[in-house]
Amino acid sequence: MALVQPHGGKLTPVLAPKEQRAELKAKAEKLPVIRMSSRESSDCLMLGMGAFSPLTGFMTQADYQGVIDNMHLASGLAWPLPVTLAVTKDQAASIEVGQELALVDDETDIYVGIIKVADKYEYDKVKECKATFFTDDADHPGVQKVMSQGEVYLGGDIVTFSEMGYATKYAGYYAHPAETRALFESKGWSTVCAFQTRNPLHRSHEFLCKIGNEVCDGLFLHPIVGKLKKGDIPAEVRFECYKAHMENYFNPATIEMRVYPMEMRYAGPKEAILHAIFRQNFGCSHILVGRDHAGVGSYYTAYQAQEIFDEFKPGEILCQPIKVTASYYCKKCMGMATEKTCPHTKEDRIAISGTKVREMFSKGELPPLEFGRKEVLEILTKYYQSLEK
């Protein structure tokens, strides 16, 4: 059997070949500049590598409206979240359709790409937040981003010529969809289960990963290394944790790890759909979706991110969810268990979550081995001790 097809049938990367990048950068440096937020820059990188196939740029109004209204592009393909480039009304007034603009990351001043403007349109920020995050609460980190950005969107195809240092920083672990597909094929895998994470792996994560590994040919550990919210553990620390976990507790023949540069939106259910779609592009047939996937705070119900998959027709999304219930360490079972399989009471359970682990470390407490593996806890202990200094 072959790997699943990319979303829309083919990969559509827009990252220029290496031999063209210097020339494109020189061209961009002579163009008017759009300074991008960290989220927009990370979306450029995802578009560049083809992770957001079939998209080849920032959404025009027709695609944007379809996504907001019914989670589908104008073509009819499923797509859950806006991929947009915002400017102020004052900026938009001097921008013409057909014009080329340089895309520059605002935080680093790195030139990332060029957009050819095909559309510019105003949008309703509150409507977008309610459609995307199911809330317009100003405390939601995704809402904060939308409400603070410009009032006009620019749509149009882009070409990128920078990966903003990720490929060097995570050498050997930073891969494009075409590369992971070739990797999976070389290993003889046709079914691949993705595991999305923004936390170091605790025992519950490991347990869920091994469920996915049992039912598919291979497991694809695919942590996010783009920007997270304040309080989340930095990517560099998590990366060391992932490597320690893989080296000591997984069969190297049936697991691969690569990282990706997207910024979390914390859009819960709709972000779970996006995670499935771009994992399909990376070659994955399945994705583990657990409790409160891609959530934040208490904005989403426990299994809302699983239920939303049922809103799509069969075949619309080829990367299918493996829906798993909350897992924990059961003292009577003397091992990991789930609500579905374990008959014992709450008093017998040691509930495990990334939030709980972070809270314990921040208080100077060392989580027990029921929470995490020794090698990982040692890395995290050093990190939290460095914060105290």
UniProtKB/Swiss-Prot annotation:
Which keywords are on file for this protein?
ATP-binding, Nucleotide-binding, Nucleotidyltransferase, Transferase
Task: Please name the top-level EC class of this enzyme.
Answer: transferase
GO MF, one term, reads: ATP binding
Signal peptide extent = none
| Cystine pairings recorded for this chain | none
A matching Pfam family: ATP-sulfurylase
Substrates-to-products reaction catalysed: sulfate + ATP + H(+) = adenosine 5'-phosphosulfate + diphosphate
Per the record, the pathway is:
Sulfur metabolism; hydrogen sulfide biosynthesis; sulfite from sulfate: step 1/3
Q: Which GO terms describe its biological process?
A: hydrogen sulfide biosynthetic process; sulfate assimilation
**Among its keywords, does the record have Acetylation?**
no
Matching NCBIfam families: PRK04149.1, sopT
HAMAP family this protein is in?
Sulf_adenylyltr
- Descriptive protein name: Sulfate adenylyltransferase
